UniProtKB/Swiss-Prot annotation:
Protein name: Matrix protein 2
Designated gene of the protein: M
Regulation: The M2 protein from most influenza A strains is inhibited by amantadine and rimantadine, resulting in viral uncoating incapacity. Emergence of amantadine-resistant variants is usually rapid.
Virion surface side: 1-22
Any one biological process term the GO annotation gives: protein complex oligomerization
Subunit structure: Homotetramer; composed of two disulfide-linked dimers held together by non-covalent interactions. May interact with matrix protein 1.
Organism of provenance: Influenza A virus (strain A/Swine/Wisconsin/1/1967 H1N1)
One protein family per Pfam: Flu_M2
């Protein structure tokens, strides 16, 4: 005897959606929130580099460089970059015995 004959299979009417009362405001609100969440998640995944770069660097404006010679601007940029660069000497190698 096959295992399939031993298992109860739901009849077709049990598979259908039982929420025929879709005029319920809670169901409508949940649907709208779900769709908005999906749209925002997709946009976040598509543009996350632009969005987070804007938050990280765009909101923290540095000092104004108006009237400052280009050589001093370049020196300032270099200092800022050196402060950001990771120094490999800070890492500790642990050897387990």
């Amino acid at each position: 005897m096959s295992l399939l004959t031993e298992v109860e299979t739901p009849i077709r009417s049990e598979w259908e959606c039982r929420c025929n009362d879709s005029s319920d405001p809670l169901v409508a609100a949940a649907s709208i929130i779900g769709i908005l969440h999906l749209i925002l998640w997709i946009l976040d995944r598509l543009f996350f580099k632009c969005i987070y770069r804007r938050f990280k660097y765009g909101l923290k404006r540095g000092p104004s460089t108006e009237g400052v010679p280009e050589s001093m601007r370049e020196e300032y940029r270099q200092k800022q970059q050196n402060a950001v660069d990771v120094d490999d000497g800070h890492f500790v190698n642990i050897v387990l015995e």
